[in-house]
Every structure is written in C-alpha cells, then in structure tokens.
C-alpha cells in the first residue's frame, strides 16, 4: 500500500473531524465522561481493528484516549489509515 502524499493527507483531514496529522501519523484525542467509558470505546475500536487487521496505537490517560494511525509496514499514512480514522469516528459516535 502506497504512502499518501502530504497533499493527499491534507485533502482527507476535512472529512475526519477531530483528527490531525502529528509526528507522521493521524491522531485524535477524545476525553470521555468516565474512565470506563474510555475503556469501552477502546474495546469497540479494538474489536473492529482485529477484524480489519489494522491496529491503531492507543494511549489511555485517565479519561483521555488518543488514537494514532500509521501503516508501519509502508512507513507512513496510507488510505488504510484514513479509512480506519473514518471507522473510529463512526464507532465513537454510536
């Protein structure tokens, strides 16, 4: 899978509310009402990621969860990461 150019990532970001490009990855931080709400969101994202065999890096800091997406095997952000960001947004809105 090809790494997206900076222009391609910039074009995708307006369609990915809450996401930004940082440190070579797509990143989104979400503050949940409670710690357990954050853990539940991580579980739902993890189940989908397992199904797709594309796993975000996930950082949990009390009620704030940060998701980071980069295709390590390709060495950068790919269309697979953009699609996963869209799905994470869908999962979090449920």
Swiss-Prot record:
One of its GO terms (molecular function) is 4-alpha-hydroxytetrahydrobiopterin dehydratase activity. Transmembrane segments: none annotated. Its EC number is 4.2.1.96. Keywords: Lyase. It catalyses: (4aS,6R)-4a-hydroxy-L-erythro-5,6,7,8-tetrahydrobiopterin = (6R)-L-erythro-6,7-dihydrobiopterin + H2O. The keyword Lyase applies. InterPro entries: PCD_sf, Pterin_deHydtase. One of its GO terms (biological process) is tetrahydrobiopterin biosynthetic process. It comes from the Bacteria. Belongs to the pterin-4-alpha-carbinolamine dehydratase family. This is Putative pterin-4-alpha-carbinolamine dehydratase. It comes from Mycolicibacterium smegmatis (strain ATCC 700084 / mc(2)155).
């Amino acid at each position: 899978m090809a790494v997206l150019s900076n222009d391609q990532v910039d074009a995708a970001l307006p369609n990915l509310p809450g996401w930004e490009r940082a440190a070579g990855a797509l990143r989104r931080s979400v503050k949940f009402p409670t710690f357990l709400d954050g853990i539940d969101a991580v579980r739902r994202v993890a189940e989908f990621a397992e199904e797709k065999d594309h796993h975000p890096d996930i950082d949990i800091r009390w009620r704030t969860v940060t998701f980071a997406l980069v295709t390590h095997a390709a060495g950068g952000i790919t269309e697979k990461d953009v699609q996963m960001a869209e799905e994470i947004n869908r999962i979090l809105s449920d």
